Amino acid sequence: IMGRMAAAAKEGGASGIRAQSVSQINEIMKTVDLPVIGIIKRDYPDSDIYITPTRKEIEELLTTPCQIIALDATNRKRPNDEKCEDLVKLIHEAGRLAMADCSTYEECVAAQDMGFDIVSTTLCGYTPYSEMHEGPNFELLKKCVDTLHVPVIAEGKINTPQDLKQVYEYCGVFSAVVGSAITRPQLITKCFADVL
């Protein structure tokens, strides 16, 4: 089904796909010729990090042709006490781009300094110490765009076309990832049902 979802996204104007799991990435990349940001979500008992948390997930992603590998780059403890810098190095040694999923400005700066090729605000509001917003954190995005030299991708809580327009026009982001607003039919249906 994810291959069909990706084909529909491409038909609608998407210029890339963010996908979770080796099987979904492979299916999508057989179906569409768009760049793919690959992740694997996996829980570990010794850490709150679950987006591409360890070397194991990166090695799994490297079996796919995805061009970009995204991982949690927050200040939290990684499983097995692994170091983010080592994971970035592993990604680069394989000739792929590394994308940092961050929750604060300081994490975005640290990710850039660590050698990440791209930073994103994916985890803003999802760590205990980051600000929760109903929509995208426009001020955080603008500050990152204005001060960092790596591309900034807006991700997280882009719920409307107006949100997307604002992250480009006001914040000046390089690109944006729209997730649940497109990929979860139950949430789309709920938005309509809730007005009745």
Q: Where would I find each of the regions flagged by the language model?
A:
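Conserved N-terminal beta1-alpha1 strand-loop-helix module at the mouth
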Residues: 1-59, 63, 98, 106-114, ...
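Charged helix-capping and loop-helix junction motifs
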Residues: 1-3, 50-56, 82-86, 133-141
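Glycine-rich phosphate-binding active-site loops on the catalytic face of alpha/beta enzymes
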Residues: 11, 40-44, 64-78, 118-131, ...
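Structural preference for beta-strand elements that scaffold enzyme active sites
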Residues: 16, 35-37, 67-70, 97-99, ...
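C-terminal helical cap(s) of enzyme catalytic domains, especially alpha/beta-barrels
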Residues: 31, 133, 139-144, 181-196
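Catalytic cores of alpha/beta
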Residues: 48-49, 53-63, 103-117, 149-154, ...
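Hydrophobic, well-structured mid-protein blocks that either form specific transmembrane helices
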Residues: 57, 61-106
